Amino acid sequence: MGQPEGLERFDSPGKGRGLKATRSFALGELLFTCPAYTYVLTDTERGNHCDFCFARKEGLSKCGKCKQAFYCNVDCQKGDWPMHKLECSAMCSYGQNWCPSETVRLTARILAKQKTQTERTPSETFLSVKEFESHLSKLDNEKKELIESDIAALHRFYSKNLHYTDNAALVFLFAQVNCNGFTIEDEELSHLGSAIFPDVALMNHSCCPNIIVTFKGTVAEIRAVQEIHAGDEVFTSYIDLLYPTEDRNDRLMDSYFFTCDCRECSTKQKDPAKLEIRKLSDPPSHQTVKDMIKYARNIVEEFRRAKHYKTPSELLEMCELSLDKMGSVFVDSNVYMLHMMYQAMGVCLYLQEWDGALKYGEKIIKPYSKHYPAYSLNVASMWLKLGRLYMGLEKTTIGTKALKKALAIMQIAHGPDHHYIAEIKKELEL
């Protein structure tokens, strides 16, 4: 099993392990692909996507026993059985009470795979799952308690089919999954599932990444979004890059236990535009701005929690009230305004309030293009959503323009032969 050409694992100064280019890669060029070591389709996409290959199609066939897993055909069903058998009978016996989290489901699959797979897999040419960083010593009590509740769920839902190692080994594995797991997303950045991609996990983070990770089914594809020269380290981004430096580093420290020293974090060059305030004849005081940033950070977190218990209408009202309040100090292109507009747009799409969704999307797209790096999937997916909204509302001229903007980014990020590209080209022919 050979390593991809033009790349090598190395010790990155101050960062630990990393991946380095040993030749040049052009913009849009594929560096390598990595099949998922294990993966799981998210509950809400059941019936829309095949549980095995993640293909999106109508008329998928149900598992005859549990009626909860869906497949393209018999081959996909057989391919998935080694993993689905961990859950099939438990789904039947627990019925509505079968509710392990996605992390628990993914970890159960890792344990099952490790039982049968003793050799290194094609997903581990640079880095093996056993080498994953866990940051166990850095976990606070809250994170440890979450892991313990995941372990309890693992015992509850999987004890018939999995024989566990001791508790300490499970804590270690869950900590590894929390730091090294990936979410698989579609072309509009909707969540499709969770997966482990060991070779992708080797790459270090930068807020100015030179590659982008996209997905073709359950395979990760890594392409250059800047020219890469021999000797350059290959950097991905672990987080959403919309936010200002302090927020990005808080998120990195909370999830991955480090802060970033990339060019963007050192210069904070984009922060003034990201945090721009209104130019008023009576400018707000420094304290007023500080208080509003604090309010904005709190409302972002509050909204994230509210999604689990509030109705869509209540969520939309929450967005509108916060936008009114922040709008007295922040300009519309301020990232906290954009964050709440994006949430509001999502609620409007869910409620099928197309005009409302369009209103927010139109305000978001221009600042997104400024705040995000070139060839950003966040920008591409926003153009795509807008294009599809325009087309649905029979505004074909402007819809065509928006879809073409999405296409221009995606041809670099996803590669010209990706099935998403073919689908969008088909939409442009209508």
Curated annotation (Swiss-Prot):
| Annotated binding of S-adenosyl-L-methionine, by residue | K15, G16, R17, H135, N204, H205, Y256, F257, F258
Q: Does the keyword Metal-binding apply?
A: yes
Q: Which keywords are on file for this protein? A: Chromatin regulator, Cytoplasm, Metal-binding, Methyltransferase, Nucleus, S-adenosyl-L-methionine, Transcription, Transcription regulation, Transferase, Zinc, Zinc-finger
**Entry keyword Iron:** no
Zinc fingers typed MYND-type, residue spans: 50-88
| Binding-site positions, Zn(2+) 2 | C63, C66, H84, C88
Task: Supply the enzyme class, top level.
Answer: transferase
Q: Which GO terms describe its cellular component?
A: cytoplasm; cytosol; nucleus
One Pfam annotation, family name? zf-MYND
- From the UniProt record, list the reaction(s) this protein catalyses: L-lysyl(4)-[histone H3] + 3 S-adenosyl-L-methionine = N(6),N(6),N(6)-trimethyl-L-lysyl(4)-[histone H3] + 3 S-adenosyl-L-homocysteine + 3 H(+); L-lysyl-[protein] + S-adenosyl-L-methionine = N(6)-methyl-L-lysyl-[protein] + S-adenosyl-L-homocysteine + H(+)
Q: What does this protein do?
A: Protein-lysine N-methyltransferase that methylates both histones and non-histone proteins, including p53/TP53 and RB1. Specifically trimethylates histone H3 'Lys-4' (H3K4me3) in vivo. The activity requires interaction with HSP90alpha. Shows even higher methyltransferase activity on p53/TP53. Monomethylates 'Lys-370' of p53/TP53, leading to decreased DNA-binding activity and subsequent transcriptional regulation activity of p53/TP53. Monomethylates RB1 at 'Lys-860'.
Specify the protein name: N-lysine methyltransferase SMYD2-A
Q: What is the organism field in this record?
A: Xenopus laevis (African clawed frog)
Q: What is the lineage of its organism?
A: Eukaryota, Metazoa, Chordata, Craniata, Vertebrata
Gene symbol here is smyd2-a
